[in-house]
Amino acid sequence: MNKPMEDAAITDVKKRYSAGVLKYRQMGYWMPDYVPKDTDTICLFRITPQDGVDPVEAAAAVAGESSTATWTVVWTDRLTACDSYRAKAYKVEPVPGIPGQFFAWVAYDIILFEEGSIANMTASLIGNVFSFKPLKAARLEDIRIPVAYVKTFKGPPTGLVVERERLDKFGRPLLGATTKPKLGLSGRNYGRVVYEGLKGGLDFMKDDENINSQPFMHWRDRYLYVMDAVNKASAATGEIKGSYLNVTAATMEDMYERAEFAKELGSVIVMIDLVIGYTAIQSMSNWARRNDVILHLHRAGHGTYTRQKNHGVSFRVIAKWMRLAGVDHIHTGTAVGKLEGDPMTVQGYYNVCRDSVTKQDLPRGLFFDQDWADLKKVMPVASGGIHAGQMHQLIDLFGDDVVLQFGGGTIGHPQGIQAGAVANRVALECMVKARNEGRDIKNEGPEILRKAAQFCAPLKQALDTWGEISFNYTPTDTSDYAVTPGVA
């Protein structure tokens, strides 16, 4: 979109810095001829201007309010290198098929952000600008982070490859389950659930996001019973096992204390929740790196700002920030389960976690190429309303480098927890075997599972119980550039 000359940036210094109010594009925040530098951070915003607000002016306002501008001209601008410090909106396009919404591309000089700080970057990009009155709504859809800035972050403390080496498990997805019910179990009963799941063939068990240290179960009791279960299951199966011990707490001091105790007990992995905040996440990443412990991130709270398509932050952006911040696992959706997730969009999240270079892929919501500069890869986690009868879909969608977590799909098994774990492990092994033999598991999957169930009573019971269960709702966050195919 091009605007007439009277709306162009004012170059006369006297006029530009005269006291009063100027349009944002006149102050230099709209630069349609700007070519982003390799060292620029580029953000794609979805903006919905108020009625009567020009979309170019709205884009310029986003650039201004997320970098150096305020509502009026200030004389102290002349004490800075304004041309470097101003963010630059350089392109605006209508969102396909959605009247009143626009995509705005905004470039930020690398000098605007503190090295290795997600908190500082987000204070600019999703700070006051999201409350700006001339906008009905704004959403950060995607971000291109320059290699020069990526290199200021340490990234995942363990990474996908080293995690597999530590666990000695290759060529298949990892299996997990969340202990249920989330709240109310005693420490001893909690440990019994963990043992049964791991003994039945799961690689991991897991605390849920809201189990910390409540009156019915102190965190120290849980850790002791859980690690006793992990050690016994490892001895019984000959496999390395783990259970995500949630160290989320009210203060960093409490979190460090819990993490240290988990390490002393021999846990290979600890867990944190997204709600602890970006600074706490980076702090726990540093701890995990120093102590050779895998760091699992539950994305608790993300749906409050990622789910709505017109306002907030896309989860693909959160996934990028978390890879920089340094987590080894992150929940990324299932597409076929109970939680929000369009199949192609969710695949885009997985690409962000696992690629060395994430390529632009508009049908999957990826607007930019992203070079990760050899930053370690994150293991995506699929969790929420999945069961053994969907194994072919999950492997077809997400491949091997994923943790498939069947909480209710393990612990709700009619024959018990261990039987539920057996059902999931057999379903996984038969599907991987069929895939490796060259079979079309997407289409032949149900038949492959039925044949395997002839020799595995727990799998047969799982298919009989949940085989017809699906969550067929229209996702709210879908690609603007492709019709998403069904998951069959």
Curated annotation (Swiss-Prot):
In-chain residues carrying the UniProt-annotated modification N6-carboxylysine: K206
Active site (UniProt): K180 (proton acceptor), H298 (proton acceptor)
Pfam families per the UniProt record, alphabetical: RuBisCO_large (PF00016), RuBisCO_large_N (PF02788)
Residues in the signal sequence: none
An example Gene Ontology biological process: reductive pentose-phosphate cycle
E.C. number: 4.1.1.39
SUPFAM superfamilies noted in UniProt: RuBisCo, C-terminal domain (SSF51649), RuBisCO, large subunit, small (N-terminal) domain (SSF54966)
Cofactor comment text: Binds 1 Mg(2+) ion per subunit.
Catalytic activity line of the entry: 2 (2R)-3-phosphoglycerate + 2 H(+) = D-ribulose 1,5-bisphosphate + CO2 + H2O; D-ribulose 1,5-bisphosphate + O2 = 2-phosphoglycolate + (2R)-3-phosphoglycerate + 2 H(+)
The protein's required cofactors: Mg(2+)
MF-aspect GO terms: magnesium ion binding; monooxygenase activity; ribulose-bisphosphate carboxylase activity
Note: The basic functional RuBisCO is composed of a large chain homodimer in a 'head-to-tail' conformation. In form I RuBisCO this homodimer is arranged in a barrel-like tetramer with the small subunits forming a tetrameric 'cap' on each end of the 'barrel'.
Protein family (similarity comment): Belongs to the RuBisCO large chain family. Type I subfamily.
Complex and partners: Heterohexadecamer of 8 large chains and 8 small chains.
Protein name listed in UniProt: Ribulose bisphosphate carboxylase large chain 1
